Amino acid sequence: MLKRFLTVSLCLLLTLAAAAQTKKTATKKATAGPAPDKAYLQKIWDGWATLDPANTAKFYATGPHTFFDIAPLKYNSWDEYENGVKGVLAGYKSAKFTVNDDAAIHTEGNLVWATATVKDEMTNKSGKVEMGAFRWTVVFENEDGKWLIVHEHVSAPLG
C-alpha cells in the first residue's frame, strides 16, 4: 500500500510540475520593412557628411531614453545631441565617412545591433585634412516600421 501511495504521489507531483511549466513562445512583433543593412548604415554616415545634424535626425529616436556618447558626458534627447554636435561640426567645411566591410549586423525581433569601423576624412575651416578611422556600435529599434537609433557609441583608438 505504501509503495502504491508513493507511486501515485510521485506521478501527481510530476504532473503538477509539468503543468506548472509555461511554454515559452516568441513574443516578438512582426517588423515592418527590412532590417538595416550596410547600405542603410552608410546612409546615416552620408547624412553626417553634410555636417548638418538635421540631415540625420530621421535616423534617430527622439525619446528620453536614447543614448549618445559624444562630449559632454551625455545627452538626454535628440534635441540636446543635435544642439551639442552643431558646435563640433561648425569647425569643419567638408566630411566624408565610409562604413567599412567589417560591418556586422544582428537582428532580434524589433531590435538590431550593428558594429563597424568607419573611415573618416574631414577638412576643417582652415583647410587641414584630418583622416582616420573609428569604431561604431549602434542599436536600432523598429518604431512604427522605421528602424531608429536608440543607442550609439563612437570611439577611436588611443594614439
Would you name each region that the model predicts?
Residues 1-9:
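Bacterial N-terminal signal peptides that target proteins for export
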Residues 12-19:
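Hydrophobic h-region of N-terminal signal peptides that target proteins for export
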Residues 21-62:
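Short, low-complexity N-terminal intrinsically disordered segments enriched in polar/charged residues
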Residues 35, 53-108, 131:
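A solvent-exposed, acidic/Ser-Thr-rich amphipathic alpha-helical stretch
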Residues 109-120:
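A short hydrophobic beta-strand element
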Residues 120-124, 140:
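Beta-strand elements of well-folded, non-transmembrane domains
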Residues 125-131:
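A short acidic/glycine-rich loop-to-helix N-cap element
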Residues 133-158:
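Short beta-strand edge/turn micro-motifs at domain boundaries
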